[in-house]
Amino acid sequence: MTVGVLALQGSFNEHIAALRRLGVQGVEIRKADQLLTVSSLIIPGGESTTMAKLAEYHNLFPALREFVKMGKPVWGTCAGLIFLADRAVGQKEGGQELVGGLDCTVHRNFFGSQIQSFEADILVPQLTSQEGGPETYRGVFIRAPAVLDVGPDVEVLADYPVPSNKVLYSSSTVQIQEEDALPETKVIVAVKQGNLLATAFHPELTADTRWHSYFIKMTKEIEQGASSSSSKTIVSVGETSAGPEPAKPDLPIFQ
């Protein structure tokens, strides 16, 4: 298995190092044709506007969208979450191009500026169930985004409480409002939808590799599913062309 890491800007080296600790090869991706050589892709944290401009300059967006549509596993961290979202608010004037595919609305820099970056322990029940370890994960939030709402097919993996004076989002008016703020509410910071995984924080900046392990297993499951589907299709075609021979049970053709 080879995992690609988009290497335009940001913490791509840290992701590759985390993969290496798990015995998985990570390769830097800077050109569209390099996506053909990898099983899955990580879009790292960084400065999302800069990353988008570089991706546009290298004409990467069409290839990235096709990679997602093909069902290839993609994990976005921080800026990568913004890339994968279908909708984004709080962007700079003119906005930025998105890859899309994740049915959610994300708020860029929801938690504030660089000096408001922080670390916090977040509950991660599904991660703990699959990977073991502590019930919490140390999230590193650097100018971090947050997911404001999700579609019905999106699974929420982690959320984080925000204080009562934090500005909230109203999806009905597509505006930022605080008039209906609750004493305490939660925003979503990790999600999964099909072949897409996204975290608002930076797992690559910690020694805890459980999120990377989770993504590797997710990649293997998707690859095995695709291989199984392909095998059944090949067997089915063979039976159709065999004419009057009796139908045979589906058998694995790759050992």
Curated annotation (Swiss-Prot):
Gene source species: Arabidopsis thaliana (Mouse-ear cress)
Compartment(s) where it occurs, according to its Swiss-Prot or TrEMBL record: Cytoplasm
HAMAP family: PdxT
Pathway of action: Cofactor biosynthesis; pyridoxal 5'-phosphate biosynthesis
Note: In plants, synthesis of vitamin B6 does not involve deoxyxylulose 5-phosphate but utilizes intermediates from the pentose phosphate pathway and from glycolysis. Vitamin B6 is an essential quencher of singlet oxygen in plants, that can protect cellular membranes from lipid peroxidation.
InterPro entries: Class_I_gatase-like (IPR029062), PdxT/SNO (IPR002161), PdxT/SNO_CS (IPR021196)
CDD domains: GATase1_PB
Subunit structure: Interacts with PDX1.1 or PDX1.3, but not with PDX1.2. Binds to RPA2A.
PANTHER family listed in its UniProt record: PYRIDOXAL 5'-PHOSPHATE SYNTHASE SUBUNIT SNO, PYRIDOXAL 5'-PHOSPHATE SYNTHASE SUBUNIT SNO1-RELATED
Stored PROSITE patterns: PDXT_SNO_1 (PS01236), PDXT_SNO_2 (PS51130)
EC annotation from Swiss-Prot or TrEMBL: 4.3.3.6, 3.5.1.2
Main location: cytoplasm
Tissue expression pattern: Strongly expressed in roots, stems, leaves and flowers.
UniProt keyword annotations, A-Z: Cytoplasm, Glutamine amidotransferase, Hydrolase, Lyase, Pyridoxal phosphate
Changes seen on gene knockout: Embryonic lethality when homozygous.
Annotated protein name in UniProt: Probable pyridoxal 5'-phosphate synthase subunit PDX2
SUPFAM superfamilies registered for this protein in UniProt: Class I glutamine amidotransferase-like (SSF52317)
Domain of life: Eukaryota
Catalytic activity entry: aldehydo-D-ribose 5-phosphate + D-glyceraldehyde 3-phosphate + L-glutamine = pyridoxal 5'-phosphate + L-glutamate + phosphate + 3 H2O + H(+); L-glutamine + H2O = L-glutamate + NH4(+)
